[in-house]
């Protein structure tokens, strides 16, 4: 018999229906389920795929550099970052009429172009790139790295170069390599680049390979380092009237702790950033020497973990068994990695706007909005991914005997308490927050706005004051204008930091009031409900009171057969599926809040947010409707402008989003009947019936149809908001 796809599973390949195709796609990356898989091949496949991922990333970033160098206006932007709009790439579209050609020809281009809202211009400028030649050089280098990564991936699948399973499970060596070799050395290299190339570039000195060894980044070179006078590197920083990229007001310091922002660029001082990366490098290089490897020196992670048994006995056997459990489960490791990466990505979103590291990015409002929203959505998907692989660990890899009475087992034993507490928190937040919003809406509707319940976020204001914000009048050390702490801080510790906190030209510690209090708790509701669904899915993955043998059915199952009513929708996959909706919902509230708060801040009418954000109609009318009206009116037979494409995407995103409900609401039986009717008609239609199929057409499983619906919902949701965000921001600020 001829070999049928999928080749990795002959069980699926023998299926006579179209399930063969869909199940083949669904399990293509589930290496553990493939025929003839061994532990060694499993690890080697994953390891090789990492190199493939790196190759894609390098190719993508190379493409960014290449297209900006070829079709962008980087050199013109460098001359005037405030007024030249950065170009991402040209548009060649045969559908464009003359009005569209004129609308999209901007930024000094000769034809239609897309603007760049990714911040790459500001990033490249900050790190010392100045010409198109620099961009081409970077593109070629990254293309080379992409090729090397592909080669490495292929090489590590060859018999001679395949690593052994013991190599993959050598946790101490891997930690040392990642901490010192990757994080430590790369942070040190980046600090070196900033000191040798970027900082001189910010002071009008163009450093490249031809003069790299001739230009000292500091007048005395390594002298202060070798003589122990490290403080000299911080002396004579650039002045407050320094013009970025020129010698005017430039200093000589290379490693400082100034705090605050460069007055012209409104970004962190490059010398502070270099100092930060040097410190990070030092910590990681030391951290990477901690664990016991070749020479028997250092800590054993297993020993440390197993020593953690609280003497009170309330955590049982503590961390015993965890080392082998984690080390032998790639799902556990992936879950930990995704959770960590998700948190970091969300932190990046928060810090990119509040502490901008790239020159002039703070004044590019559309880019600020796009980057914040992008990183928050990415963080959401990564975090929910962590809670997909956690349950898979519990189903496939968890060994109750190995983990008896340790912290992991005790989490499972206490799951009712954990789930019910999360449920209580979600209910409390939901009813109280919605109750306050609805009360305020009713008061507005009845013409008595003075009867709104408006709660000042006193505790949050106190925390801001403790960090040095003086607006609220709290008499605590860093915010008391006469106190010694404030004066000492200004003179000794981060002199620019306290000034930055109290300036209104940045996003540090924004002034907050009752509207912020309410939306904070709405977001808290979303976070707690998302967490409730995800944690419940993980803790019930092996079994529940309703279905004690759930683990025997795997990670996803539609229903577990006749005679067991009520067991649909309770697989761990279903919890992941439900949680993604709540995640999207929550990040919607987060990004709405961030965007509206900043639009009013940038336009100088913060009172609009303060007055309208305390009731739901205010959000619907003064944020969503007011900012989408340009898009709703954006496509007409008579008018074409640079927002027209966003108006089209706004419409298209709604359509994709709505399509999702077709798959989410109509389930398998409906589709099976429809398919059989269509197949019957096809077979009886002349000409059409000349085309036959080998596989009997059957409907998608419930789980697969839910996935199709979820993908449409997510993609449409994000496309809709992306179009709204970019158009409403760029329409106001250019």
Curated annotation (Swiss-Prot):
Q: Which BP terms does GO give this entry? A: photosynthesis
Per UniProt, the enzyme's principal EC class comes to oxidoreductase
The annotated topology with respect to the bilayer is: Multi-pass membrane protein
Residue sites binding chlorophyll a B3 per the record = 662, 670
Any one GO CC term of this protein is:
photosystem I
Q: Which locations, inside or outside the cell, does it occupy?
A: Plastid, Chloroplast thylakoid membrane
The answer, when asked if Membrane is one of the entry's keywords, is yes
Residues that bind chlorophyll a B1: 654
The record's annotation in PROSITE patterns points to: PHOTOSYSTEM_I_PSAAB
Q: Which residues cross the membrane?
A: 46-69, 135-158, 175-199, 273-291, 330-353, 369-395, 417-439, 517-535, 575-596, 643-665, 707-727
Q: Name one GO molecular function term.
A: electron transfer activity
Residues recorded as binding [4Fe-4S] cluster, renumbered to this chain, are: 559, 568
How cofactor binds (record note)?
Answer: P700 is a chlorophyll a/chlorophyll a' dimer, A0 is one or more chlorophyll a, A1 is one or both phylloquinones and FX is a shared 4Fe-4S iron-sulfur center.
EC number, as in UniProt: 1.97.1.12
**Annotated catalysed reactions:** reduced [plastocyanin] + hnu + oxidized [2Fe-2S]-[ferredoxin] = oxidized [plastocyanin] + reduced [2Fe-2S]-[ferredoxin]
Query: What Pfam families does UniProt report for this protein, alphabetically?
Result: PsaA_PsaB
| NCBIfam families, alphabetized | psaB
Tell me which HAMAP family the record gives: PSI_PsaB
What family, per the record? Belongs to the PsaA/PsaB family.
Q: How does it assemble?
A: The PsaA/B heterodimer binds the P700 chlorophyll special pair and subsequent electron acceptors. PSI consists of a core antenna complex that captures photons, and an electron transfer chain that converts photonic excitation into a charge separation. The eukaryotic PSI reaction center is composed of at least 11 subunits.
Stated name of the protein: Photosystem I P700 chlorophyll a apoprotein A2
What is the species of this protein?
Pisum sativum
Q: Which gene encodes it?
A: psaB
């Amino acid at each position: 018999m001829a070999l049928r796809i999928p080749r990795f599973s002959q069980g699926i390949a023998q299926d006579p229906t179209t399930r063969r195709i869909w199940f083949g796609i669904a399990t293509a990356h589930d290496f553990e389920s493939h025929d003839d898989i061994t532990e060694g091949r499993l690890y080697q496949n994953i390891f090789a795929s990492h190199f493939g991922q790196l190759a894609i990333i390098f190719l993508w970033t190379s493409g960014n550099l290449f297209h900006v160098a070829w079709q962008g206006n980087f050199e013109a932007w460098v001359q005037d970052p405030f007024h030249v709009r950065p170009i991402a790439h040209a548009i060649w579209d045969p559908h464009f009429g003359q009005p569209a050609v004129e609308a999209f020809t901007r930024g000094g281009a000769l034809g239609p172009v897309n603007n760049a809202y990714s911040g790459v211009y500001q990033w490249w400028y900050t790190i010392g790139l100045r010409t198109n030649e620099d961009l081409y050089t970077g593109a070629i280098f990254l293309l080379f790295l992409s090729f090397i990564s592909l080669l490495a991936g292929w090489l590590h699948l060859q018999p001679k170069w395949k690593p052994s399973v013991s190599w993959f499970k050598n946790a101490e060596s891997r930690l040392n390599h990642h901490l010192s070799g990757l994080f430590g050395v790369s942070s040190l290299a980046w600090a070196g680049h900033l000191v040798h190339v970027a900082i001189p570039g910010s002071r009008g000195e163009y450093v490249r390979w031809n003069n790299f060894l001739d230009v000292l980044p500091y007048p005395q070179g390594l002298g202060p380092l070798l003589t122990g006078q490290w403080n000299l590197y911080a002396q004579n920083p650039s002045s407050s009237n320094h013009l970025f990229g020129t010698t005017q007001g430039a200093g000589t310091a290379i490693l400082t702790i100034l705090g605050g922002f460069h007055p012209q660029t409104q970004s962190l001082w490059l010398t502070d950033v270099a100092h930060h990366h040097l410190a990070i490098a030092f910590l990681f290089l030391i951290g990477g020497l901690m664990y016991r490897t070749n020479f028997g020196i250092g800590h054993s992670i297993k020993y440390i973990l197993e020593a953690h048994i609280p003497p009170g006995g309330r955590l049982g056997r503590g961390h015993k068994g965890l080392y082998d459990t984690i080390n032998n489960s790639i799902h556990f490791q992936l879950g930990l990695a995704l959770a960590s990466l998700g948190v970091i990505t969300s932190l990046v979103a928060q810090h990119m706007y509040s502490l901008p590291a790239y020159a002039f990015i703070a004044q590019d409002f559309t880019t600020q909005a796009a980057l914040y929203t992008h990183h928050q959505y990415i963080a959401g998907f990564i975090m929910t991914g962590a809670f997909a692989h956690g349950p898979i660990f519990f189903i496939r890899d968890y060994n109750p005997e190995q983990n008896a009475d340790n912290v992991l087992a005790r989490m499972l034993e206490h799951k009712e308490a954990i789930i019910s507490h999360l449920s209580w928190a979600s209910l409390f937040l939901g009813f109280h927050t919605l109750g306050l919003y609805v009360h305020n809406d009713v008061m507005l509707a009845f013409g008595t706005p003075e009867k709104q319940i408006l709660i000042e976020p006193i505790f949050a204001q106190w925390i801001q004051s403790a960090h040095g914000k003086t607006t609220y009048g709290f008499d605590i050390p860093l915010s008391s204008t006469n106190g010694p702490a404030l004066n000492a801080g200004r003179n000794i510790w981060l002199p620019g930091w306290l000034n930055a906190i109290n300036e209104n030209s940045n996003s540090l510690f924004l002034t907050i009031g009752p509207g912020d209090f309410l939306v904070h708790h709405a977001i808290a509701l979303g976070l707690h409900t998302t967490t409730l669904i995800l944690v419940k899915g993980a803790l019930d993955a092996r079994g529940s009171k309703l279905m004690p043998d759930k683990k025997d059915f795997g990670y996803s199952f539609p229903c577990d057969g006749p005679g067991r009513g009520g067991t649909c929708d309770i697989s761990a996959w279903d919890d992941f599926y439900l949680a993604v909706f709540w995640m999207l919902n929550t990040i919607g509230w987060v990004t709405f809040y961030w965007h509206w708060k900043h639009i009013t801040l940038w336009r100088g009418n913060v009172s609009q947010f303060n007055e309208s954000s305390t009731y739901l109609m205010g959000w619907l009318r003064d944020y969503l409707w007011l900012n989408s009206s340009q898009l709703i009116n954006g496509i007409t037979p008579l008018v074409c402008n640079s927002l027209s494409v966003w108006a089209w995407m706004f419409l298209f995103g709604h359509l994709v989003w709505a399509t999702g409900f077709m798959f989410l609401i109509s389930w398998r039986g409906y589709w099976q009947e429809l398919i059989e009717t269509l197949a019957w008609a096809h077979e009886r239609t002349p000409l059409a019936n000349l085309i036959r199929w080998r596989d009997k057409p059957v409907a998608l499983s419930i789980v697969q149809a839910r996935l199709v619906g979820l993908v449409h919902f997510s993609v449409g949701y994000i496309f809709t908001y992306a179009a709204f965000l970019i158009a409403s921001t760029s329409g106001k600020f250019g």
